[in-house]
Design a protein with these regions (language model features):
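Short alpha-helix
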Residues: 253-271
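A short acidic, Gly/Pro-enriched loop at the edge of an enzyme's catalytic core
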Residues: 111-123
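Conserved class I S-adenosyl-L-methionine
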Residues: 3-60, 72, 157-199, 226
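Short, glycine-/aromatic-enriched active-site segment of Class I SAM-dependent methyltransferases
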Residues: 128, 171-176, 233-257
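Class I SAM-dependent methyltransferase core
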Residues: 65
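Class I SAM-dependent methyltransferase SAM/SAH-binding core
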Residues: 70-112
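A short glycine-rich, Lys/Arg-flanked "PGG" loop and its adjoining helix->strand segment in the class I
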Residues: 140-152
Length: 289
């Protein structure tokens, strides 16, 4: 792992010796492992490059990206001349980061990052980490770990995925977003349906006729963001190409949290963690704590 050892030669990979949460880590990474070979088509999403530009002047090296995926953000920071490293839960994502970008990322759980105290000036939690966790106690563990490995004057950024108001409204109407939890597995299954199947499915979920269901879908599509449209089309192509779509769906969690700005503020209030700044971009919220 040259990217890490060149800058921090005292790294100790304690996670290799912890069987309890290593087992949990393997289970949690199943979906990302299954998605890895298709991820290049959708990776510039949520905490994307335009969103990164919103905070770029507040980022100081060395930087650690947690949930680095296949290295999109790490590479972008390095191109800006910053010393940036990354960790991720998924072994397959890490393998593709090496294959596609020549990056050596470290496999680690965000709750126990294998670096010394005060090793970084900036910690960035990409989307797919904190925002995918429902349990406040687990999030608190992650934030405590960030405080440990960042310098006293350092900065911590936490990204939360964002959907458009029209998409949020559609998911609520179809019963796919309730009590701030998205029925992720069910949403994922929609990408494998053709248009007729989707309309029939929506009519059943909304307890409405086909014409009304068609109107709901068209209205949502019309007011969705360009990024949402492109992501949906990319996901449909992935499901047409994948050999076993069911395995990808089965690897996904049943549900995942969705937090709008108000819910994000409520989360940090419960955690007794003051928000220094909250940036709302087209595709994500970025919280500085």
């Amino acid at each position: 792992m040259p990217n890490v050892s060149e800058y921090h030669r005292d790294v100790v990979l304690v996670w290799e010796h912890s069987t309890q949460w290593k087992s949990e880590m393997n289970h949690s990474s199943d979906f990302w492992d299954a998605l890895a070979s298709h991820h290049s088509a959708i990776e510039n999403n949520y905490l994307d490059l335009p969103s990164l530009r919103r905070i770029i002047h507040d980022i100081h090296q060395p930087v650690l990206v947690v949930g680095a995926g296949q290295g999109l953000i790490v590479e972008a920071l390095q191109k800006k001349g910053l010393h940036a490293e990354g960790v991720d839960l998924s072994a397959e994502m890490i393998r593709y980061a090496q294959k596609r970008r020549g990056l050596t990322l470290v496999r680690a759980d965000a709750r126990a990052i294998p670096f010394r105290d005060g090793a970084y000036e900036t910690i960035i939690y990409a989307t797919g980490v904190v925002d995918f966790i429902a349990d406040d106690a687990q999030i608190q563990m992650i934030l405590n770990e960030a405080r440990r490995i960042v310098t006293q004057s350092g900065r911590i950024f936490v990204a939360f995925y964002r959907i458009s108001a029209s998409m949020e409204d559609l998911l609520i109407r179809l019963g796919l977003l309730r009590n701030n939890v998205m029925a992720f597995k069910e949403v994922l299954g929609l990408y494998g349906m053709n248009l007729v199947q989707t309309i029939a499915w929506a009519a059943g979920k909304a307890d409405a006729g086909y014409l009304h269901a068609t109107g709901l879908l068209l209205r949502s599509w019309a007011f969705s963001t360009t990024k949402e449209k492109l992501t949906a089309l990319s996901m449909q192509r992935i499901f047409r190409k994948v050999a076993d779509a069911d395995s990808l769906i089965n690897a996904a969690p049943e549900g995942q949290p969705y937090r709008n700005e108000g819910e994000i503020r409520n989360l940090f209030t419960r955690l007794a963690t003051p928000i220094s700044k909250l940036e709302a971009t087209a595709s994500c919220y970025i919280v500085e704590i």
